[in-house]
Structure formats: structure tokens, C-alpha cells
């Protein structure tokens, strides 16, 4: 019955999704401020059409929130669905094979910005609710909260949650904004890494200098910056910042055995990335490095003359953007300060170093023995025919730990993305058959959750 409904309504549901995708809700670009409001309003319309009791676009200190609810019984359990309607910028446009905000279906995939992250995945949740509501199968309450700033750090959502705790009160949170190991290998994300981010500025002379007249007499800020950041990581892949690993919890032998059982083709992985060899912290597998271990990376570096031709200067300043992915129990505020203190301590006298802290967030671990997780397991089994593997991933959704802190509930991360979906990149896509299976799986989650509740 579920599969039949999804198949019969496929074209309508896809067109509804496309109406969201066509709105370029790029939160990072002020030019799209009105598009953020338009997208929020469209979400409100679609949730009302799906059958919620009420839906509203609510103000925040930044982009608006979309809230909706269907209360079947005030005494029943409540599932809160979280997602985000903002998307990453589509640039560089010339690398897209299709128009990023004009979705098309080609080769069995939806091609568009937001096809996966997160309009495509969030809309699965709305369509699963639609089915349950239309067929009088919903035995627990449902609430929805969609924000418009996830791609820029969710700056408004924390204060919004704090202000509306009663409105958002629930027993569990359900999120589709993560991925699967493979199209036929279901998995549930049980861990997210946290994040710290900085910009470092190294200043030498008070102006750009002629490299002939002054070369050899003063330090070059770019050279100094390169050495400073290169020295952070040793040849063994270890991060040399004092105290960095103090709160890192080692994976148990049981967890490491589970990780080792996850299907992973290292040669195919290297091929897909276009690299000849992998590099990371010694003593850990690639999956462990990306899910269970912290990192330190340079995200961008610049300074001096970078235009066409030649200009022989010693620059006055050099800059870099830095990030760390953190594991549960590492406090991003503590790590941020450790990094600032480290660079200040190793900065040579012939330059001035300034490290500016940017946004950050904590990691998250989901237990695999509580009712909602078990319901998710059975939901995947019903559709994919096999039990999903619990996996930790390298990415961050900082607001998940905020939900736990402010609302006191756990989140189940039922994602359906694939690495090949190219989120944040040109040619983002989502396989149509996987999108439909996602709707079916979420429906089954709710049916199984009622048995647990």
C-alpha cells in the first residue's frame, strides 16, 4: 500500500519539490534575502496541503523559521522533524551541466541545487507525513521546524529554540540531512563531528615592500604563515597543539570491529577523489579518521600579489582560514582558545599574529538502544531488506547538540544522501528511486515508532 501510494503520487510530489528548488534560497548571499522569505512561505503552503493543523512563518533574528504541527492526541508522543530550506551558493555556474535552480530529471536523477541538501531530504519527511495523515495512520503528534541558516552556522536557531521551548517540546527529533554508505547499503548516522573555525592574519612590515630593496632584511609574512600552519600537523598525522586530544574518547574495540565491517573500497575511494595515496593520523583506518578522530585543516590561504603577470613584492600581510572537525566530548570553545593560544605562543618576534575565532559547534552521538533508533532500524529493514549499519560521519550539524542541550531529547539521523550526490558542489543531484525509497522508509519509521511508544 505504501509503495503504491508513493508511485501513484510520484509526479505530483516531485513537482511540489521542484517548486521549492526553483527558489534560490542562498543564505550566504544578501541578494537572496527576499528568496529566503519566499521559500519559507512556500514551505508553509506545502505543509498545510500535506495536512498539518497549522503552519506559520515565524520571525527570528535572521531568516524566518517555518513551524508546523499536527496534534492527534495531547497525551501521545511527539516527533519533531528538523530540516533547513537554505542552500549553498551554486557558483561556479559554468561547471553545472544544468541550470542549478531549474530542476530536471535526467538519467534517473534530480539535478539541482538543493535536490539533496536539504530540500530533497526534508521534503521526504513532509510526504511521509502526508501519507500517514491521509490514511489515518498517525498515532503520535508531529511537529516541523525548518530554518534558513544551516549553511551559515544556524545563528538564529539557538535563540529561537530557547525562546520557544514549549512550542518545540517533543520526545525525539527526526532529521534527514545525512547519507547512506551506498544506495543498497543502508546506514543510520550515529555520530557527527563538531567544528571550530578561525581566520589567522600574519603581519610583517607596515606596507608591501620591494623584494629587491628589502628582500633578506625582513620576514615574509606568507613564508611565516606557511610554516606556522604546516607545523601544526606532524608527519604521523598527529595535531601538535598542546591539549588538543585531552578530551578525545578512543573508540572501543567493539566499535572498531564494527567500523572494520563497513564495506569500503580504498582503491575506489582514491580513484573517486583523484589522488594516488591517502594521508591521515597513523594507527587509524580511513573511516575511523573521518568519523572518530579530530582534524585540523587549512581551508584557504592568500596574500601578496595574485593577479596576472609578475609583481615583485614582500607582502605586508598574509591570511588563512582554518578549521577543525571535533569529536564528541571536545568542547569547541575550549579548542578555539587552545588554537589561539598556540599560535600566539609560537609566533616569531618579527611578525604579529592575530587569530580571530569564527563559528563552531559540538559533536553528537546517538545511542543505538533507544526506541526511536530501533524504529529507524526496522523502517530501513522494511524497505531495503537489510538492517542499517550505525556509522559516524565526518560532517557537522552543530544545531543537533543544541537541540539536545535545550530540549533534552535525542535526535535520530535518517539520511538518504550519497557521496555521488555532490552536495555543496556543482551538479548536485538525488536519484529519484532513492528519494522515493526515503519516503517509504520514513513512513515505516513512524509506524514502527508507534509500536515502541
Question: What are the roles of these predicted feature ranges?
Answer:
Residues 116, 206-208, 324-332, 361:
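A generic structural motif
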Residues 85-87, 109, 145-153, 176-181, ...:
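Acidic, glycine-rich active-site loops and adjacent beta-strand->loop/helix elements
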Residues 76-143, 437:
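Active-site metal-coordination/substrate-binding segment of hydrolases
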Residues 159, 215-236:
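A short core secondary-structure module
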Residues 49, 182-183, 240-317, 328-338, ...:
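An extended, acidic, His-containing surface patch that forms the Zn2+-binding/catalytic region
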Residues 1-93, 317, 334:
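N-terminal helical capping/dimerization or prosegment-like subdomains
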Residues 187-203, 417:
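Flexible glycine/proline-rich, aromatic-decorated loop/lid segments
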Residues 116-191, 453:
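Acidic/histidine-rich catalytic neighborhood of metal-dependent amide-processing enzymes
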Amino acid at each position: 500500500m505504501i509503495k503504491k501510494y508513493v508511485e501513484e503520487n510520484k509526479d505530483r510530489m516531485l513537482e511540489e519539490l521542484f517548486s521549492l528548488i526553483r527558489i534560490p534560497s542562498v543564505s550566504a548571499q544578501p541578494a537572496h534575502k527576499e528568496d529566503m522569505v519566499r521559500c519559507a512561505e512556500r514551505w508553509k503552503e506545502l505543509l498545510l496541503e500535506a495536512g498539518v493543523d497549522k503552519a506559520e512563518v515565524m520571525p527570528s533574528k535572521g531568516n524566518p523559521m517555518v513551524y508546523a504541527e499536527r496534534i492527534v492526541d495531547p497525551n501521545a508522543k511527539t516527533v519533531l522533524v528538523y530540516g533547513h530550506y537554505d542552500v549553498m551558493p551554486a557558483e561556479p555556474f559554468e561547471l553545472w551541466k544544468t541550470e542549478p535552480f531549474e530542476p530536471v530529471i535526467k538519467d534517473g536523477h534530480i539535478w539541482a541545487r538543493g535536490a539533496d541538501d536539504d530540500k530533497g531530504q526534508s521534503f521526504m519527511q513532509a510526504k511521509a507525513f502526508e501519507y500517514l495523515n491521509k490514511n489515518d495512520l498517525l498515532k503520535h503528534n508531529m511537529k516541523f521546524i525548518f530554518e534558513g541558516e544551516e549553511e551559515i552556522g544556524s545563528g538564529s536557531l539557538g535563540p529561537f529554540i530557547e525562546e520557544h521551548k514549549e512550542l518545540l517540546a517533543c520526545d525525539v527529533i527526526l532529521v534527514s540531512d545525512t547519507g547512506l554508505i551506498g544506495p543498497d547499503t543502508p546506514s543510520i548516522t550515529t555520530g557527527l563531528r563538531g567544528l571550530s573555525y578561525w581566520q589567522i592574519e600574519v603581519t610583517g612590515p607596515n606596507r608591501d615592500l620591494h623584494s629587491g630593496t628589502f628582500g633578506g632584511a625582513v620576514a615574509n609574512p606568507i613564508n611565516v604563515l606557511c610554516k606556522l600552519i604546516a607545523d601544526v600537523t606532524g608527519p604521523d598525522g598527529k595535531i601538535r597543539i598542546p591539549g588538543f586530544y585531552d578530551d578525545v574518547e578512543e573508540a572501543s574495540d567493539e566499535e572498531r570491529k564494527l567500523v572494520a565491517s563497513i564495506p569500503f573500497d580504498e582503491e575506489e575511494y582514491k580513484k573517486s577523489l583523484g589522488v594516488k595515496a591517502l594521508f591521515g593520523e597513523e594507527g587509524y583506518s580511513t573511516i575511523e579518521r573521518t568519523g572518530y578522530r579530530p582534524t585540523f585543516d587549512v581551508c584557504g590561504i592568500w596574500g601578496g600579489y595574485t593577479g596576472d603577470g609578475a609583481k615583485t613584492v614582500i607582502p605586508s600581510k598574509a591570511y588563512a582560514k582554518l578549521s577543525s572537525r571535533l569529536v564528541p566530548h571536545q568542547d569547541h570553545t575550549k579548542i578555539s582558545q587552545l588554537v589561539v593560544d598556540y599560535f600566539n605562543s609560537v609566533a616569531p618576534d618579527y611578525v604579529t599574529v592575530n587569530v580571530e575565532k569564527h563559528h563552531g559547534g559540538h559533536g553528537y552521538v546517538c545511542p543505538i538502544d533507544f526506541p526511536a533508533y530501533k524504529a529507524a532500524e526496522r523502517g530501513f529493514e522494511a524497505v531495503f531488506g537489510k538492517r542499517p549499519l550505525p556509522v559516524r560521519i565526518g560532517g557537522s550539524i552543530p544545531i543537533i547538540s543544541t537541540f539536545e542541550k535545550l530540549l533534552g531529547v535525542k535526535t535520530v539521523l535518517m539520511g538518504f544522501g550519497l557521496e555521488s550526490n555532490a552536495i555543496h558542489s556543482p551538479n548536485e543531484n538525488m536519484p529519484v528511486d532513492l528519494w522515493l525509497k526515503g519516503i517509504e522508509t520514513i513512513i515505516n519509521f513512524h509506524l514502527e515508532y508507534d509500536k515502541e511508544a
